[in-house]
């Protein structure tokens, strides 16, 4: 098969030939332009799936039509103790433009809780052993209204090293402990608000990893699990996923968890940086001009300034699906959408 024919086998796969344009490649805080050897295979992301026109409506529908359990409103009673856990700043990357999807989910959930007389509500960031989010980051993620009402007493980071704030809920068949955030574990209802960007996000991993302690984490976040995983992004071939599933089943047996999972598209850039999503062979004169302008500007800035400039560009992710209910049926549907 000729190179000219091979390069057209899929819209996201290109084989470099004599007529191919130079390729843009990230290099630290820079972008370089290089002519690649003939025959090099270049992979591009699929075009972004169109976002849902009304994400608020999609979230409300999911809450009222859950998988494997009663609707959220039917599980609420006045005076009950509810904890809402949310993904930390590691999802998504780069950070999304505001309002964050977590803010939208929280606004809808908190209004529903208030409407059913549920006043004992805490919001916990499921940061596991990641660094704790800063006050500014926490405010940006949930918006001023929620932040001002709940921070700092009822909106805070999970602390995996605070012994009094942890409780053991079980152990695996290998006697590996599962120790979780005490507030979450002792609540009448734990609601988890999740964002799925890649297949290793969400599902059983959300609670079992996001709200655990070091001893629980060390059983699967270690070199042997990495060696035993063909790919973190293929759950069926991931030892990490298998271990998280075993822990997650303990969570589901011991706690009442209501998952809200969302899938987002891959629309990382728009406007002056949208050319970075394109095949260089399809660049217009304006695209090339934007790249040269960006490269020239970057070359004149010190490294810290380049880094700050790149990180100041929020991603333009859009929600493409939302499902709610029990862990596995919800995650199966979200993963299927993410793989599209």
Residues of each region from the PLM?
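Conserved, well-structured core segments that form the ligand-binding/active-site neighborhood
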Residues: 148-339
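Glycine-rich phosphate/diphosphate-binding loops that line cofactor/substrate pockets in enzymes
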Residues: 67-88, 115-118, 340
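Histidine-anchored nucleotide/phosphate-binding helix
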Residues: 93-117
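Short amphipathic alpha-helices and their capping/turn segments at secondary-structure boundaries
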Residues: 62-77, 177-186
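Acidic/glycine-enriched edge-of-secondary-structure segments
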Residues: 40-66, 88-95, 320-340
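N-terminal amphipathic/basic leader segments beginning at the initiator methionine
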Residues: 1-59
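Short loop/turn segments at strand-loop or loop-helix junctions that form parts
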Residues: 81, 85-90, 194, 262-263
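Short internal beta-strands
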Residues: 117-129, 260
């Amino acid at each position: 098969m000729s190179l000219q024919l091979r390069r057209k086998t899929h819209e996201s796969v290109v084989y470099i030939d004599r007529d191919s344009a130079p390729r843009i490649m990230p290099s630290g805080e820079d972008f370089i332009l290089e002519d690649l050897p003939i025959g090099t295979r270049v992979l591009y992301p699929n075009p972004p799936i169109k976002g849902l026109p009304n994400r608020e409506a999609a979230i409300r529908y999911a809450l009222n039509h859950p998988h494997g359990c009663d609707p959220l409103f039917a599980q609420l009673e006045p005076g009950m103790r509810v904890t809402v856990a949310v993904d930390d700043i590691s999802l998504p990357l780069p950070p999304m433009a505001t309002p964050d999807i977590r803010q939208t989910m929280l606004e809808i959930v908190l209004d529903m809780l208030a409407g059913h007389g549920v006043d004992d509500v805490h919001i916990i960031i499921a940061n596991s052993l990641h660094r704790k989010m800063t006050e500014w980051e926490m405010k940006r993620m949930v918006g001023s209204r929620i932040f001002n009402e709940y921070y700092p007493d009822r909106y805070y980071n999970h602390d995996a090293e605070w012994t009094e704030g942890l409780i053991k809920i079980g152990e695996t068949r290998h006697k590996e402990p599962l120790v979780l955030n005490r507030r979450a574990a002792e609540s009448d209802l734990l609601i988890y608000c999740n964002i799925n960007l890649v297949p290793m996000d969400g599902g059983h991993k959300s609670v079992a990893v996001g709200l655990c302690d070091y001893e629980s984490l060390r059983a699967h976040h270690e070199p042997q699990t990495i060696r035993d995983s063909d790919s973190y992004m293929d759950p069926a071939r991931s030892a990490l996923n298998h271990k998280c599933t075993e822990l997650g089943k303990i969570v589901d047996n011991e706690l009442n968890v209501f998952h809200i999972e969302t899938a987002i598209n891959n629309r990382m850039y728009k406007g002056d940086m949208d050319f970075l999503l394109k095949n260089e062979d399809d660049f217009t004169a304006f695209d090339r001009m934007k790249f040269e302008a960006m490269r020239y500007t970057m070359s004149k800035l010190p490294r810290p300034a380049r880094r700050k400039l790149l990180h100041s560009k929020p991603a333009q992710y859009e929600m493409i699906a939302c499902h709610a209910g029990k862990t596995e049926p919800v995650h199966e549907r979200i993963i299927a959408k993410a793989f599209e």
